[in-house]
Every structure is written in C-alpha cells, then in structure tokens.
Amino acid sequence: MEVTVSNLSYTFSPKQPLSLDHVTLDLPKGSRTLLVGANGAGKSTLLKLLSGKSLAKAGHISVGGKDPFRESSSAFVYLGTEWVNNPVIHRDMSVARLIASVGGDKFAERRDFLISILDIDLRWRMHAVSDGERRRVQLCMGLLRPFEVLLLDEVTVDLDVLARADLLNFLQEETEVRNATIVYATHIFDGLAEWPTHLVHLSLGRIVDYGPISKFGALMTRSSTGNSALLETCLEWLKEDKKNRGTREEEKRSTWDDVQESLKVGTDVFTDYFKISRAK
C-alpha cells in the first residue's frame, strides 16, 4: 500500500512547539523506508499517526487510500517499544500460549519460520525472559499475520546481531515477494547499507530531505572509514541536527547554576538513596 502524507502538523498541546511541522511524504507500495532523525525529531509521532493511534488534526494521511485513524485494518501493523511495558506480557505464561493467542495455528508455516529466525524457545515463560527475548516474542506475534503496511519504531534495539540480520532479510523479502510497505525508525544503522529503498530525514518535526536511495548517490559506495556510506551520511545529518537544535534552544536551557537553589529545597527518598550508597 502507498503511504501519503500531505501538509501534516501535530502538537501534543497548544502551548508546546509543533512535534510535526507541515510534513509531506509519498512512499510507494513495496518500499522500505528508513526514518532518520535525532531523539525528539518527530519519528515516533509520525509513525503513531500513520498507524492510526493518534488523530491527525491538521493535514492529511492516506495509507492505501484510507485514513488509518478512521478505517483501521489488521493489514496495518505498528510495533513500538512500549509493548514490553505491558504488564500482561510480564505474567507467568508460556510463549507458546501467547503466540497461539494471536493466530499461531492459522499461520503455521509463517509462525515456524519466525520462531526459527528469531530463535525463540517455546519453553520460555514470559515472566522469566530477558528484554531481548521478550522483544523477539513481540516481533513474532506482530509479524505472524501477513501485513500490507508495517511501521517499526526502534523494535530491533534489544536484538543480537544475528537475530537482527535475519529479521531484516525476512522484512526485505516481504517487500520484494508480497509488495508490502515498511517504514522503519532506528538509531542502529549497522547492516542497513543496502536495505532501504527510501530515506526520510526528520529534524525538529520537519522534513529536511527524503526520496529514493538513488537520490543519495554517495550512499551506494563505502566510506574511507570502513563504515557504510549510509552510516556516515546519517551521522552527518544527526550532527547537523544537534547543531541546529542547540542554536535554536540555547536560550531556553538552564545551566547548572540556575538549578542549584531548587536542589537545596526539600528531600527525596530516591535521590537520598543514591547519596548514601555513593558515599560508602
């Protein structure tokens, strides 16, 4: 499905700056788009709006010709970091039961393949797994049903190198064989040099640049540092973002001297713990 965004603006509060500022995008069906931007650039906000989890009050969003907020579909899949904080998936239950609850029997072949590439042990108990293992289960559950649009927000952060590489290969095949569309926000660029078909650079809620990978010709070659040219380019973008962000916000930032007086007032049991433990 094609993903189209036109003149999209969004703020969490009228008193706050825009989290997204007149964003316009057109991502074709079957594309693999990498969202690049510093923390606070608006990547997560954009993905949640595309998934229909939040209402776009200014501008227009179309996913496969539909408004994702008003016309939700099981073909639209959003996977974000907040899932691991859900108390339900920290209970003493088997991984097999959890996977079965979302259609594990209906998509048996796909289930077995995902369990294999994500290296999931069906004997795991959810209350006793690591963060990385819990993330693998989330990905298996989220990818179990064939999707048409997949929105990923930092969900590979807990995966080891092998699991992440196998997952990226699987996702690439999904776009090439089934013509699915993927939008992926991450700060981990290892192994991505030849993965994306499109790049989007977000900074302070605005699109700095975007387009097919062919538009960024230098990315197709390797840099002299040994890093992929994609990684080097993203690093340069993020450095420039930080520089611009600092210039615009410098007057708003407090110095350590500014907050000294507030530290003298009152007490806190949590910070007192650190004072005592570090004093030993």
Swiss-Prot record:
> Transmembrane segments in this chain: where?
none
Gene3D superfamilies xref list: P-loop containing nucleotide triphosphate hydrolases
Q: Which subcellular locations apply to this protein? A: Cytoplasm; Nucleus
SUPFAM superfamilies assigned to the protein according to its UniProt record, in alphabetical order: P-loop containing nucleoside triphosphate hydrolases
Which keywords fit this entry according to its UniProt record?
A: ATP-binding, Cytoplasm, Nucleotide-binding, Nucleus
Span of domain ABC transporter: 3-229
Give this protein's Gene Ontology molecular function annotations. Answer: ATP binding; ATP hydrolysis activity
Give the record's GO biological process terms. nuclear-transcribed mRNA poly(A) tail shortening; regulation of transcription by RNA polymerase II
Single GO cellular component annotation? cytosol
- Which named protein is this? ABC transporter domain-containing protein C20G4.01
Origin species, per record, is Schizosaccharomyces pombe (strain 972 / ATCC 24843) (Fission yeast)
- The residues forming a coiled coil are none
Record: residues binding ATP: G37, A38, N39, G40, A41, G42, K43, S44
